Amino acid sequence: MNPTDPQHEPLRVGPTKILPAGVIQFQEYLSGETGIEVIIDARTRESYVATVALVPYGAPHPGAGGVWLKGWSENEGVPQALELAGVVRLTGRKHRSGWVIADHGELTERALQVRDHQLHQRKR
């Protein structure tokens, strides 16, 4: 493995209205959907789940490389910050879940590479 490969470089995001800037860490739900966590302090590994690639009640599967993003409450502006950082491309699709609406995004090619690398490293 070459440490200069793009998947070895962290993806950064933020700040948003409420959250400070941080580094993206990908997770995977048991159902296979992608989760996104923002690590705020890399030294202490303090994390804040700034955007959980939600599985909103009744929502269709987000698709391969797709995510449902929480952009309300403390996560206001997070989907837009993820797009600005080159992590996702917002598709304009939305899904109402109760009183809130989740935004649909698709991971960029670079984000897919980083996600696959991070998940592979954890499974070793």
Per-range role (PLM):
Residues 2-58:
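Short alpha-helical segments that sit at the start of domains
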Residues 41-86:
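Acidic, aromatic-enriched beta-alpha/helix-loop junctions
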